[in-house]
């Protein structure tokens, strides 16, 4: 954690997510997504030892991210900046922190899924070097049905 937060001159800070963060995480998750993760999913990720981070500003949780790492690959499972602070660089900061963690675990590539309708996230991922490598049909729940997922990847080596 110290390597991620030590060089930060701003009033925001990154730290590992804890179970006692889940009330605040869920509050942001519910505001950010029409089909949010459940508290149980976050709890299970933490208990499984997945790297998970929160971003705080002046003591208030404004973002979080969850990563899984196995067999030389990392998978970004959830990355979210609170709606009121989106487009301020917080998502990029969280993404870069996850990429640093993945590199530290010697992951060779990082994968993620994103809704095709999420233009801001797609632009962020492209800006950090991710490329679209596929599509998962009907992956996400959506109002009135299902939405595909774009599968994106970044080679770290």
Located regions from the model:
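Conserved catalytic-core motifs of GNAT/GCN5-like acyltransferases
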Residues: 111-113, 126, 131-151
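Short glycine/proline-centered loop/turn elements that form peptide/ligand docking sites
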Residues: 95, 118-121, 138-143
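ABC family nucleotide-binding domain
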Residues: 85-86, 90, 118, 124-128, ...
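Short amphipathic helical patch at the helix-1/turn junction of helix-turn-helix
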Residues: 81, 115-116
């Amino acid at each position: 954690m110290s390597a991620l937060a030590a060089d930060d001159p701003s009033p925001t800070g990154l730290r590992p997510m804890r179970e006692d963060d889940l009330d605040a995480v869920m509050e942001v998750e519910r505001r950010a997504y029409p089909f949010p993760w459940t508290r149980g999913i976050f709890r299970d990720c933490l208990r499984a030892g997945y790297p998970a981070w929160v971003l705080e500003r002046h003591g208030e949780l404004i973002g979080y991210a969850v990563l899984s790492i196995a067999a030389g690959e990392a998978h970004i499972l959830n990355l979210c900046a609170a709606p009121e602070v989106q487009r301020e660089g917080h998502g990029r900061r969280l993404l870069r922190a996850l990429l640093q963690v993945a590199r530290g675990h010697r992951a060779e590539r990082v994968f993620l899924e994103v809704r095709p309708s999420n233009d801001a996230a797609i632009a962020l991922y492209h800006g950090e070097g991710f490329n679209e490598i596929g599509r998962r049909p009907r992956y996400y729940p959506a109002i009135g049905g299902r939405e595909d997922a774009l599968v994106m990847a970044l080679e770290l080596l």
